[in-house]
Amino acid sequence: MVRIRLARGGAKKRPFYQIIVTDNHQARDGRFIERVGFFNPLATGQAVDLRLNMDRILYWINHGAKMSERLYALIKSAKNKSQYSSAG
């Protein structure tokens, strides 16, 4: 099954997450099919904390991909704030 989920990057105690489309059996930070955005929980000032390519996310959902619970919550909050970009 294909999943849309977060892959952790960044340094120790400074997380940075890539939003990726991957096979269910791959490791959290392992091989992925496509990168569809990022999430920076420590963004301050004018730094972008969330960028989503909603066109590609909707494409994968329509083709049977399932989102993680955390990603679902991020997208829901982004829609409320109108922060996401549909272009990428």
UniProtKB/Swiss-Prot annotation:
One of its GO terms (molecular function) is structural constituent of ribosome. InterPro entries: Ribosomal_bS16, Ribosomal_bS16_CS, Ribosomal_bS16_dom_sf. GO terms for biological process: translation. GO terms for cellular component: cytoplasm; small ribosomal subunit. PROSITE patterns: RIBOSOMAL_S16. This is Small ribosomal subunit protein bS16. The keyword Ribonucleoprotein applies. The keyword DNA-binding does not apply. Gene3D superfamilies: 3.30.1320.10. Pfam families: Ribosomal_S16 (PF00886). Keywords: Ribonucleoprotein, Ribosomal protein. Belongs to the bacterial ribosomal protein bS16 family. PANTHER family: 30S RIBOSOMAL PROTEIN S16 (PTHR12919), SMALL RIBOSOMAL SUBUNIT PROTEIN BS16M (PTHR12919:SF20).
